[in-house]
Amino acid sequence: MGKILFFGLLLICIFLGFFFYKQKENNVIYNKIVEKFDDNVFVDETYTYLFKDSNLKELVFIKSQLIIPELKHKKMIKATGYRADAYKALSTVYRFDFKVHDNKILGFKSVIFEGFEDAKVSKHENNLPSEKWQQLKDFNIGDPNINEKFFHLEFPFVVKNTLCVTISKGFFKKIKKLKRLKIMLISNEDREYKIDIENFLPKYNL
């Protein structure tokens, strides 16, 4: 009985390891998770860049794919309407998560990608599903004042703030061509957080 349990657990570990693995290269930690439900597949890939000497601790790039065979049919690709349009807009989502540690809850009123200062930015809430996602131009930074009532508070512990920036496929293709990622975040207190790193995105098949 003990041997059966041991080999059962071993098989489970191998199975999980097949769908979930980590790879660290040049300060970038790579994760991939594949989940299947019915005939549908969800693939989540994350690329985490770690910072050492700053309140800005992590830059995380996330590519999420939802594969629904029924909606990938040629007829559906040419179809129009809310369901078809929503799937086309959301089947692949690109996102940057910026993780900033402080003793306060922060809001971020501006995100600037150097070289694309004229990019079209939206500030609607990151709720899905939403018709607004079908109208995403360059990138969305969410509502900067969603936690405004807490901005004045200071805490005796570290607050881990996360700014989620969803980018369009077209804008992703543009920043993928850059040699370096130069990004500036501006908080509700006008504090600037600057990023200047080698662009790791072209190294991966995205």
From Swiss-Prot:
Subcellular location: Cell outer membrane
A Gene Ontology cellular-component term: cell outer membrane
Keywords: Cell outer membrane, Membrane, Plasmid, Signal, Virulence
UniProt effect for mutating K72E: In strain: 297
Major localization listed first in the record, in broad terms: membrane
Keyword match Membrane: yes
A family per Pfam: BPTA
InterPro entries: BptA (IPR031471)
Signal peptide residues on this chain, from the entry's feature table: 1-19
NCBIfam families: VirAssocBptA
Function: Virulence-associated protein essential for survival of the bacterium within the tick host and therefore within the natural life cycle of the Lyme disease spirochete.
Family in the record: Belongs to the BptA family.
Protein's recorded name: Protein BptA
